[in-house]
Amino acid sequence: MDYGMISQIEKARLYAEEPERITFKTLNSTFRGDNNTYVISLDESGWHCTCPGFQSHHICPHIMTIERLLKPMLKIAPVPYAPGQNVVSDVKKMHRYAEEIDRIVFNSFQVSIQGNNSDHSVGYDQGTWTCDSNSFRLRGVSSHTIAMERLLKGMLREQVAT
């Protein structure tokens, strides 16, 4: 019996129950909206979406949905409503989209996780995980990557493809 792995699974459960330990640094996702499929990203300059609503108002129901789903893990202020934005329609869409997570696929992201002993960097890119923890270097998996898999269940590229 691999007691080290059992410990990693238990830590992952605890980390997933405390999503405020996690900070998204960057992300790239595909979002299947009602009319088209869009690419949403977050980087040091802020949010971006390829939808027409974002191009005109710098906010859209796609970003609002991601903000809602990842709220405790985003350490930035939500994008404010914009003049001319159809707020009622966008909020309704956001609520519906948040219940339909099969619309969202995370292609890549970079997060920082406050571990029990130190902070760790976790990356995900098209199904490939990276983590700077010793357990990841030894096993190719860690409590940090398992926690992210739990939190983003059904929205990761390899989970959607299978």
Give the ranges of each region predicted by the language model.
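Long, low-complexity, compositionally biased intrinsically disordered regions
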Residues: M1-T162
